[in-house]
Amino acid sequence: MALLQIAEPGQSAAPHQHRLAVGIDLGTTNSLVAAVRSGETATLPDEDGQHSLPSIVRYTQDTVEVGALAALSSAQDPKNTIVSVKRFMGRSLTDIQTGEQSFPYEFAESENGLPLFVTPQGLVNPVQVSAEILRPLIARAEKTLGGELQGVVITVPAYFDDAQRQGTKDAAALLGVKVLRLLNEPTAAAIAYGLDSKQEGVIAIFDLGGGTFDISVLRLNRGVFEVLATGGDSALGGDDFDHLLQEHMQQVWQLGDIDVQLRRQLLIEARRVKEALTDANETEARIILADGSELKQVVTKRDFDSLISPLVKKTIASCRRTLRDAGVTAEEVLETVMVGGSTRVPLVREQVEAFFGKPPLTSIDPDRVVAIGAAIQADILVGNKPESDLLLLDVIPLSLGIETMGGLVEKVVSRNTTIPVARAQEFTTFKDGQTAMAFHVVQGERELVADCRSLARFTLKGIPPLAAGAAHIRVTFQVDADGLLSVTAMEKSTGVQSSIQVKPSFGLSDTEIATMLKDSMKYAKDDISRRMLAEQQVEAARVLESLHAALAKDGDLLNEDERGQIDATMANVAQLATGDDAEAIKQAIERLDEQTQDFAARRMDNSIRVAFKGQSIDNI
């Protein structure tokens, strides 16, 4: 007799069957894949024993080379060898072309303004290039683990916006891979150390990779990882150290203008010199020119430190700002976790130790810690650890809100709110008989829409034609675990609703976030004054419109003298509303309110008389 195996919905019918899932650190410079096997978490090496895969893709006429093979050709064929593609994810072609850094690639522009790489195999976008990096990692994992993966957790920088996160998901989708979750890189590091060390308290995650810098302050308590605040710079990393060293070598050798091939050769040598100076006080830089001549120079640790010191100071300044956002001091931080290969640079470790007052944690390989944390999370999400009560709470970097009358911003979800999150707020109509309402979703900390970032617009139609203020529209903001935002507006009496998922076309850099936060503090007093003025102007418009309608209907309840006084006061309110004195507008509205109270009472009495006309007491 056949037996039916019964399981809870969403759980495996074979509770002891180990499901295959991995964590992937899709890095700017290098990428890794890790898995939990026999209770141990480790990164998976390739056939040559290499754990990290260079995030480099080269397109030839017939093949696509990825990793070390592509890196070998990067100096000879820089135009078709795409390096650090993560920096292009979610950015517009205009952003790239107007940036400070030049690239050897030939670009084309897509219909939505995003960059396309011109290659021997045609046009490819950053999502497709990212998929080529994921492909060998997935193949490596399936070969090592002996089966098809049931899901992956991919890490992204904490400041990746919706477009960049969606692009990462799309890269996996091109390979038919199920993304269990996108995980912020600092949070992944916290998982790796939190589960291993069982720490409780406040920790800082200092993540300096090849192309991005993230600083996150987290509170760890009984398996709960709560991100208190995040900061950083999406255009600062080890690649920038390499470029500074490359320029230094170029100046010492007096090379002047150089072609892209020699520039790439210099960059490769600069990276080697940087790595050598991790353990040595000096090293020799050497390159061979096209004519066969050899150039040499000694580069000391002091030279290197002098070059990169301004960038390292920028990371410390970000740490200081983020601690302030989190409401904690450096002394309250129990441990500082170092993430990313660039944290191996001695000056970085020295500055971090000096700022936080204690040596940073480096017990887990900083190159592998993110992938290890992602693997632990993947193992939980795929159902191998149903007993785990691990909870992840990330935060949104900038407040989300709705535009209201007068160009004001009504914040619905505040900055640094933990995600996933859902927040709802009720709005109403401004005019009598209004049957539609336009919604403008914005992002930022300022009081006026003009000073915030526009995310999306949508319209709710089918609102019952009621008096102004009578309809109730509930607007719900939902931010999921991947940081993607959905906004829904619903009219409560009819249930009619409209919604939109916000996926900005263009990326929002950490520099822009920092600027928006600085501006919100710099202009706080002025913004409050402007908001108060706009609020009084909107209130004046509402009162005047309502009163005009009342006078048109029941103006005969007033004598000529009373009507004249009200008209004069209304004219005064209208005139003041065009000015910039919020208090004067407020006082004029209050005088108008006092002046029309008797008129309002007469209207009420008249309405009652009309309603009860012809009715007997028994009927009432």
UniProtKB/Swiss-Prot annotation:
One GO term in the molecular function aspect is: ATP hydrolysis activity
Q: Does the keyword Nucleotide-binding apply?
A: yes
State the disulfide connectivity.
none
User: What GO terms in the biological process aspect are recorded for it?
Assistant: iron-sulfur cluster assembly
The protein's superkingdom reads Bacteria
| Pfam families registered for this protein in UniProt | HSP70
How far does the signal peptide extend, from start to end residue?
none
Q: Does the keyword Isomerase apply?
A: no
- Which family does this protein fall into? Belongs to the heat shock protein 70 family.
What is the protein name given in its UniProt record?
Chaperone protein HscA homolog
Organism listed in the record:
Shewanella sp. (strain W3-18-1)
Lineage start: Bacteria, Pseudomonadati, Pseudomonadota, Gammaproteobacteria, Alteromonadales
